[in-house]
Amino acid sequence: MNLIKIAMLSVLSFCSALLAQAEPNINGESGYINMPSGRIEADGTFRMGYSFAKPYSSIWSSITLLPRVELYARYVRIMGIPGFANNSAYGDYKDKVASGKVLLLEEDWDMPSLAFGINDVQGTGLFRSSYLAASKQFGALDATLGVGTGRISGAFAGARYTPAEWGGVALVVEYDANNYKQDKGATQTGVGQRKKGIGLAVDYRWGWLGSQLAFRDGKPGINAYASVPLEAKEFIPKLDEPAPDTEVMVRPSLEQWDTDPQYRRALIERLLKQDFKNIHLKVSGHVVEATLTNTRISLASRAVGRAARSILLRAPLGTREIRIHYTVSGMPFATYTFFDAERLQRYFNGLESRKQLAPYVAIDYAEPQKSAGSEAILDGLEQEYFQTHLDSNEGDIVSFRGEGAGLDKIRVAPGLGIYFNDPSGAFRYEVFANAAIEKQAGTGLFLKATTQLTVNQNVSGVTNPSNSLLPHVRTDVADYKKNGNVKLTQALVNQFFHPEQRVYARASAGLYEEMFGGTGGQVLYYPARAPWAFDVSVDALKQRNVGGWMGFRNYSTTTALAALHYRLPISGMTATARTGRFLAGDLGTRLEMKRRFRSGFQVGAWYTLTNGNDITSPGTPAKPYHDKGVFMSIPLGSMLTKDTQPTPRIAISPWTRDVGQMAASPGDLYDIMEPVYTNMRDRDGLQYFGDLDDSYDQPRKPTVVDRIQWANWKEDRSHVLDGLTSADTWLQVGMGLGVAALSGSLDKPADRWAVRHTGSRFSKAVAGVGNNLPLAAGGIAGLLALDDSDQRRSAASFTALEAGLVGMLASEAGKYVVGRSRPQAGMGSSDFHPLRSSNDAAGFPSGHATAMWAMVTPYAKEYQTPWLYGLAAVTNLARVADRQHFVSDTVG
């Protein structure tokens, strides 16, 4: 009987766990009101919202970037605290906060979900905290217990009651453990009087939309947001999408095709009506070749499928094979060969599946000069076919477009620019109209010009000049925005080349962008099968005058960047490293990481490390500023009733600085080719080929993340408990404490040495390298863990990540228990204040050193490379030289 009860409870608990919701708190992280939970949202969920709880208001966003990783960002306003003492125009103080959470354990019938999170990891650190939270579902009740350090000080709890019959309404209660006294301006705003306590709220969720009305100490707070599943294949049905070509025609014989040009012309006209451009046809015996591109349909495989339909309906009788060379910017990129035309027709007729068709299709990189000989017919259609459109089909409120049978086009559309965080005002904007014309003047040769008419703007209110000590390659941007209502923003000549299979090149000259013009070029190489691409770009540039016309400033520079793009073995992830010389003459590397979701949205971030030494605010001599930011590419076709290619890109950087900057490319080859490359490498390369979502029988290849035995973590609990009770473990702990105690004799002399050498070249170099080694080691271990080409290395790398995370958690716990002051506090090495809530900033043990040693140990043992411990010791030296820790902190 007891076994039956246990089984019933297990099934009930498991089923209820499936209903668990990960709703956002006022900071945007999955949680309750102010506190986080031990959950994260479903993979690919993007949320954006606004919250207000006096004195704070936030515009926030969050995304589940990976199946177990949730990231958050918010722009916080603190009411009643001036941003600048001598500048009332800026208004209240504002701060940018970046946070993240990792799901360590998924919920099971006997285990809660467990998550570790860090808040405010970059910037001012005003809201910095770290926490561990466990959540469990009990029917309609979701409950959380957790503990935090920093702003979240000590134990916290939360619960959400969401009965199905309430139709999206939920009741929320939490124990708020925030230490509001440490908040900026806590005395002036009155929030410093707020103590830890109970908060209550009512939630309402309707589809993608959600809201919360909360009360804390009798004061209301609100949170409203939208939640978008980026892993959905589409958001809006394509109600206005033109149907595929099904017009039945009398097909000519091969002799009729060769002698009567009307058949070629009819096929080209039919393709033109479906937005195909630069069409060239060639028939050789039983083989039909077509070279073309499509300017509307977003997936190359879908465009090729539509072209193949029309060719089958109008090709000569007896056609056995069809080859379609799909071009990008006039360059053939992918060749689709259909070896069995009859089987292809049966697929379009619904008589065969895509799985049956796929073995008879070859997709490869195109050879150079793969175009056919119907130029005369195409030239005759150029003037006849030129069409104009006035509509919103490309995602604009309205746009005027003109296009012909080639790649010539005219476009007039409105635009909006937004700028944050200038000291003379937090929000600046400009509304404008862009007029662009592009002309294909020859094979791969394009002429392009863009003008801008500013309709309205308040950028001219920017009064603070740039304080940058570097060449003002970006920080003078406000001068460019506010001078001249009519501007020539771009005037270019681009020549594209395709010298070899998988090799592409570009030569450019003219006005690249609003701030720079010059000459340059780029070469891109794709290997035959490897998941990476490599390009080199070199540009000789001169800075333009403000006003937007042909004048130039005296500043000239040459940028030279080599870029490696690597597609990680996890769905949609790409890592890019760009190394070389940037706009301000600084040398270094820009690291980028992004993920492409099934909807076509791309979300990513960048971080740049150069020798630019930007020490003006927000940088300091001790901590120079490094350019960083986040970006999102938005495929407008996913939000319209008709497919379209335009994909605007939004990029947000905390500050506009001159370090680590790049000029806008006249036509970045990798960006141009990436959509087609991604499409042709997506499983069998035939996504939506027949205008059908028929990939259900094409399961994605399991990734390393999929193969990780997360459940084994639960089984490891018994091993952990056994280890904690073993004599060997306590002997090792005792030896470690003994080493720390012995190293204590070095604390004072080492700190005196650090004081004497503060600011020296050696100290700066060691601190710069050693302080960043744990981050670099974690990043490298993460990439290697995802790379399944070497199972031994992948396993060691995942173990290193586990060890690093456990080391971080252990160091945080140790700081709380020991509470030792840091050298910079000036209290000496013997100042301890154990078990205090403020001990998150304590010194013993060093989190950097603990994590670094933990991460290198699995590699050192697996590959018998003890020299790696010397690399870890550099971090110890850096923490001491930077006066962040005593010697014994780094070995304890």
Describe each PLM feature range.
Residues 73-99, 116-132, 137, 144-164, ...:
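Outer-membrane beta-barrel translocator/channel fold
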Residues 41-43, 66-68, 78, 105-109, ...:
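Outer-membrane beta-barrel channels and translocator barrels
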Residues 267, 298-320, 433-437:
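Short, non-transmembrane amphipathic alpha-helical segments
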Residues 21-126, 137-139, 165-169, 178-181, ...:
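Transmembrane beta-barrel domains of Gram-negative outer membranes and organellar outer membranes
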Residues 786-810:
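Interfacial segments of alpha-helical transmembrane regions
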Residues 46-48, 59, 71-73, 112-116, ...:
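Transmembrane beta-strands of outer-membrane beta-barrel proteins
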Residues 789, 825-892:
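Membrane-embedded catalytic cores of phosphoryl/pyrophosphoryl-handling enzymes
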Residues 22, 30, 57, 62, ...:
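Long, low-hydrophobicity, solvent-exposed regions enriched in small/turn-prone and acidic residues
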